[in-house]
């Protein structure tokens, strides 16, 4: 757990799910119809899937596709804007883009404006919300916050140094925002924010759930906090009798293919749950 084997990573491009994803790459270097359309077969979500597969970060076809996005879809506010340069960029989308663009080794200069855009959209309560620059949201979203946190983590893990102190502060405050909600509860009522976020889904896409949050926290090296415990207990209760975890739900949309079926035991969720419990379970 937690150890990448470069020789296996190289094989992902020619075998199994990784080879399947790459086979859908169009001749001009993209997937689907456009960068963000349709969900979930667009370039954006396919690149995110490939990153999560831990395919070699040196894959040149993937790097070329990301460079095309950087060269053609930068918005006037510095982020990636699939809907036109003058349209306001989406925080959640740019958090995810930063995640895989960092993993696949884009030049730091190409990512600086995305960092600037994201940091400009920090909310007063510590997190992020994709509606902060459109309809004037005043409370952070767990969905946007986890996407940006994952992007910041991959950016720093990949050795980039641009605005590191600002990113560390944003990371700290965003983690605190999630912990204030015990990872899934309203900070006002203590009730579950939304029943969907306690379901184990994969792929997560842009959507938050407790396993995605816990896996981020273990990956970021965050120390155990008692406010994680309710989510950890929920995760352990979802374990099947054979020791694995299921896919409890799928996010509707077009897919290139189904890696796993809802209701079945899941290799993805089992791997992620084991990583979480290895770090946080006594």
Where are the model-predicted features located?
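Preference for long, amphipathic alpha-helical scaffolds in soluble/luminal domains
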Residues: 1-282
């Amino acid at each position: 757990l937690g150890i990448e084997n470069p020789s296996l990573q190289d094989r992902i491009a020619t075998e199994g799910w990784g080879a399947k994803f790459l086979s859908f790459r169009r001749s001009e270097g993209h997937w689907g119809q456009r960068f963000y359309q349709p969900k979930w077969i667009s370039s954006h979500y396919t690149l995110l899937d490939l990153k999560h597969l831990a395919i070699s970060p040196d894959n040149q076809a993937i790097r070329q596709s990301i460079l095309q996005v950087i060269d053609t879809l930068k918005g006037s506010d510095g982020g990636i804007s699939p809907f036109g340069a003058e349209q306001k960029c989406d925080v959640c989308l740019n958090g995810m883009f930063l995640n895989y663009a960092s993993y696949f080794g884009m030049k730091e200069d190409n990512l600086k404006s995305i960092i600037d855009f994201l940091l400009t959209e920090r909310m007063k309560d510590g997190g992020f919300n994709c509606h902060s620059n459109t309809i004037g949201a005043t409370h952070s979203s767990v969905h946007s916050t986890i996407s940006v946190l994952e992007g910041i983590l991959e950016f720093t893990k990949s050795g980039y140094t641009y605005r590191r102190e600002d990113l560390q502060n944003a990371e700290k405050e965003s983690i605190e925002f999630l912990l204030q909600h015990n990872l899934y509860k309203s900070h006002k009522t203590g009730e579950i924010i939304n029943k969907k976020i306690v379901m184990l889904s994969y792929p997560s896409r842009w959507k938050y759930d407790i396993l995605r949050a816990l896996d981020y926290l273990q990956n970021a090296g965050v120390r155990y906090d008692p406010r994680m415990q309710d989510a950890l207990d929920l995760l352990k209760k979802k374990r099947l009798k054979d020791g694995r975890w299921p896919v409890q739900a799928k996010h509707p949309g077009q897919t290139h293919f189904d890696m796993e079926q809802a209701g079945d035991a899941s290799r993805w969720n089992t791997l992620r749950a084991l990583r979480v419990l290895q770090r946080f379970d006594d």
